[in-house]
Amino acid sequence: MLPLLAGTVRAAPDGGALAGRRHRVIVSTDIGGTDPDDFQSMVHFLLYADVFDVEGIISSPYGPGRREHILQVIDCYERDFANLKTYSARYPTPNALRAIAKQGALEGPGPAGVGKPTEGSDWIVRCARCADRRPLHVLVWGGIEDLAQALHDAPGILPKLRVYFIGGPNKMWSVDAYNYIERNHPKLRIIEANTTYRGWFTGGNQAGEWGNASFAAAHLAGRGALGDFFMTQLKGTVKMGDSPSVGYLLRGTPEDPSQPGWGGKFARIWDGRKTVFDRLTTESDQVEAFGVVEFAIPLPAGMTRENSVRVVFDNRISAITTNDGRTLRFRFSPRDAKVWPYVIHSDFAALNGQSGKFAAVPPPAERTGRPSKVHPNWWIDDPDPAAAEGIHPGAKSVNRRREQFLGDFAARMRRCKTAATKTSKVKE
């Protein structure tokens, strides 16, 4: 077995929570939804709960995930708590974590992007308004609806917020809430990681014990209740696609997203990422991959707002539509660079079966090289080809530190199995 961290050629970033800076953190997660990796990332997050001031864990869309799935992981944490607290008195008690686990939105609010307050959105507002002068870091692992609702209900909290959004597929499912934030709160301090997060499980050193399956088998299996629970997800293979948001706060310079760290290195966002069509499109129509596509199509003669409409992209993804009696409006965020087909289903015969497609393509260099003046604090995956892992922009800025963050994770996981001794504390 390779000695963990041996041979690491890059020095670990020396800032962040592991260097002693305590960050206020809320996690918004679609745990229990469509991707089991949120369970893995929650295990990872709780193992570092002693170095954060954890203020909330919110269940968010998309999918069937609920607060009870957060509690499921906290139950495992409770079984390991006796050992964990011997390493640090600052691990929160299981009941303290249960008290701040909140239910957020259950589904998208529709094209407006906002709807009614939820327990989760109200909790974000409450935490942001507290007297603590430190910023509040909101790590969004799933849908961004609760953050959008919080900003809508209390726009004055914006200066306090620092957001790390695991975008990509989550942005696709939450496009209306994303559109609301981007249009109405452009000065929000946010990192939009559409592909950078993939560096946690794609590329980097995957030889020997560093492989996604071999690492889990060697360093997570049999390490307490949390380790065993981790192994029940994704057949015991590391994905942890939301963990870069945690790594960003653990090691790096969270005040400056352009600097390297465990959660990646980012670039200022550019303009022109949203495309609006007033017609059905063809393959010759191009939009930006991971951008926003909006259709505002005049209703055909004879159609009224009482007629029903459903738009399905890629034969599987339904878009929420509005029909105001004059215009049919719907949005989509293409999560990959490819041709995206869509079809309209309606009880209005002239519209039913109408279809189209468009090509999502990477943005040109002349666009990405001009930072947006409208969004001065909005950051995104580094478009530099040298930072890409295959087709994933920015992913190398994470995976080049794979041995560091996985090695540290393995050391943390050992805490679950064995109580601390004076010797083990010194080694860590």
List the model feature ranges, each with a label.
Residues 12-428:
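N-terminal acidic, glycine/proline-rich low-complexity segments
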